[in-house]
Amino acid sequence: MTMAANLARRLIGNRSTQILGAVNSSSGAASSVARAFCSSTTPITATLFPGDGIGPEIAESVKKVFTTAGVPIEWEEHYVGTEIDPRTQSFLTWESLESVRRNKVGLKGPMATPIGKGHRSLNLTLRKELNLYANVRPCYSLPGYKTRYDDVDLITIRENTEGEYSGLEHQVVRGVVESLKIITRQASLRVAEYAFLYAKTHGRERVSAIHKANIMQKTDGLFLKCCREVAEKYPEITYEEVVIDNCCMMLVKNPALFDVLVMPNLYGDIISDLCAGLVGGLGLTPSCNIGEDGVALAEAVHGSAPDIAGKNLANPTALLLSGVMMLRHLKFNEQAEQIHSAIINTIAEGKYRTADLGGSSTTTEFTKAICDHL
């Protein structure tokens, strides 16, 4: 059996069928993110943010594929507003946030925030308001789609609520600005616990804490201290600490050295995109944000690509695979595996691929090919 086939069997089999786990931060005990919603045939309601640019097109692909696969889901759609909602201080409406809180699960297309316009980031608003503390991104080589690496199979887990993304910036004097990096014990323990629980639940053997504590001794030092505390509770899992610059070099040289990586916010933003580049880009990379009380918001992390919006050229793979993560969260494992296999097989065959994957198919044609595999 070829390396690609072996990898495909692993991805579509054991690890990928596991559900995401959450952590009860008050007790430290593990709880299932896949809440006992209902059986796999009872319809549930999920919030859908089609997003900007190509978002509505790839969201339509998801709806079509889910319908073809017989997924018992009803979508509650919310769009970005045209004016800032004072309750959220962004273009996201309060009603859309309440929808996710009520449904406990959602899927989000790409959302664009104008740079330097004084608007609160839409993605940051979602993470903060919904307390989505962990961003989980599986990164794996796709059989049949050739990149520089054939054996990538790792998970990045990013602390999602603090660090340099706390939004605490100000001008000290003219020409001098200051940004505060916030690291707390509570948030660090929470994401570390999630990372080790994820590793244990998914049969992963190693957790790497990524840091720059040699320079930022207080902030990253606290993060590492919390990771060490949690690691002691999981002796069966190998724990290591890797300085972020060395981590980048090691990932590019040999990504197979890593399994699960956990890190503060900014490092996670950078490393997760680097990992996506190892397997073909953000257009192939799923993502899911985990919150407390069983909330999960899966998302496509690529841009809104306004230059091709409305031209039927967008690649829906990332949003589809994120939708698969959402289905596993909901315990719709059978439909999740069917859709996952259909996506993998369509890309592997190579007959129908969008332009970014080296093909000439439209969004509609690519989506239809996936549906045909179902």
Swiss-Prot record:
It is found in: Mitochondrion. The record marks Y165, K212 as: Critical for catalysis. It is an enzyme of class 1 (oxidoreductase). GO terms for molecular function: ATP binding; isocitrate dehydrogenase (NAD+) activity; magnesium ion binding; NAD binding; zinc ion binding. It comes from the Eukaryota. One of its GO terms (biological process) is isocitrate metabolic process. This is Isocitrate dehydrogenase [NAD] catalytic subunit 5, mitochondrial. Its EC number is 1.1.1.41. Its cofactor is Mg(2+); Mn(2+). Mg(2+) binds at D245, D269, D273. Substrate binds at R127, R137, R158, D245. Residues 1-44 form a transit peptide. Heterooligomer of catalytic and regulatory subunits. Gene3D superfamilies: Isopropylmalate Dehydrogenase. Ubiquitous. Performs an essential role in the oxidative function of the citric acid cycle. GO terms for cellular component: mitochondrion; plasma membrane. Belongs to the isocitrate and isopropylmalate dehydrogenases family. Keywords: Magnesium, Manganese, Metal-binding, Mitochondrion, NAD, Oxidoreductase, Transit peptide, Tricarboxylic acid cycle.
